[in-house]
Amino acid sequence: MIIPKKNRNEICKYLFQEGVLYAKKDYNLAKHPQIDVPNLQVIKLMQSFKSKEYVRETFSWQYYYWYLTNDGIEHLRNYLNLPSEIVPATLKKSARPPGRPFGSGPPGDRPRGPPRFEGDRPRFGDRDGYRGGPRGAPGDFGGEKGGAPAEFQPSFRSSGGRPGFGRGGGGGFGAGPTSSSME
């Protein structure tokens, strides 16, 4: 699609300035909400940039979102004749207002009680002995746990009652006769 140079410059300038660009998926929209160019031209230019890997595209809820890549930054710097000191807004550190350090502030800000963990009482109260046993090797979960006795033989068949009840028990619901009933 042929895009006038003036509109192409406006789109590129905005994209480089912000580092990101969005557009509603409406090809008939007369003008983009942020830039004074038709929405279709924004979408088509960004599709071209995407194919050259200058931007990364995300589409969600009928909106396109384009994020400038490092290659795109270099391309736009050359295209717009900008010095390397100028960077998109997404790469600038935001200046946060200095926060209060923890525990400082006006003394009447919050009532302060006695210090919480002095030496006169244990830190965790009555939980001192909890998991306080000797530690074993990693993967060893401690305690005197042994294996099953040697004579233990697990059985997964019912001990009488209702043979064939449950999964794989044989018989019932379309299964053929069990092997014990075949004679």
Curated annotation (Swiss-Prot):
Q: Which UniProt keywords apply?
A: Cytoplasm, Ribonucleoprotein, Ribosomal protein
Q: Is Chloroplast one of the keywords? A: no
> GO molecular function of the protein, one example?
RNA binding
**InterPro entries in alphabetical order:** Plectin_eS10_N, Ribosomal_eS10, WH-like_DNA-bd_sf
Any one GO cellular component localisation term in the record: cytosolic small ribosomal subunit
Q: Where is the composition biased (Basic and acidic residues)?
A: 109-130
Q: Where is the composition biased (Gly residues)?
A: 131-146, 161-175
- Superkingdom to which the source organism belongs: Eukaryota
Region annotation (Disordered) maps to 91-183
- All disulfide bonds of the chain are none
What are the subcellular locations of this protein? Cytoplasm
Query: Does this entry carry the keyword Cytoplasm?
Result: yes
Q: Which Pfam families does the record associate with it?
A: S10_plectin
Q: Which family does it belong to?
A: Belongs to the eukaryotic ribosomal protein eS10 family.
PANTHER family with a match to the protein in the record: 40S RIBOSOMAL PROTEIN S10 (PTHR12146), RIBOSOMAL PROTEIN S10 (PTHR12146:SF0)
The protein's name in its UniProt record: Small ribosomal subunit protein eS10z
Q: Which organism encodes this protein?
A: Oryza sativa subsp. japonica
